[in-house]
């Protein structure tokens, strides 16, 4: 409240006004940063200051923070938020009198972002597929509510497995491949990964390897499985 020159009650009123009926598809991610750029400023400062502190303590470490802008659906909104991030980061680095490289990329978790990946890739250093939300957005059902009907889908052989546990390679996977095929020609240095529970599923890891992803991330307890699956995928289908 003091930082914004507002009363505590005014801050509480703002928080109350942000209540939504469908927050999954509402005012979140980079939409918040467009409406309240000070949030992006605050978060960027935190990332860069932390990186600078680590760099000072460990000058022998290779450090290059990656700032990921979430929920992009339109290149223009990404560019608006990226401008805030870059200006803030550069100012913090200049004030500290240090040299620090950093990257700014985006989470790809909305189908439209996959369809327009060639535009987004022009200004993004990396893509990270958020397949939990990308699955929700593609199928049009919520991961939190799908349990009410998924068993009936299994019984009727509509689904063979939970699409939130095992990547839907036909639909969601096709969008991912499309995004890579559109993005890399305009940005050959674009590195691409996946985050979400799919990153620990062996068949999903193999699919990610086959379409050209650079890495997968997952929950800590899934890491051994993911590493083994990645090694097996490379043996089965070696990259040049």
Task: Indicate where each model-derived feature is located.
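Conserved alpha/beta-domain cores
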Residues: 1-240
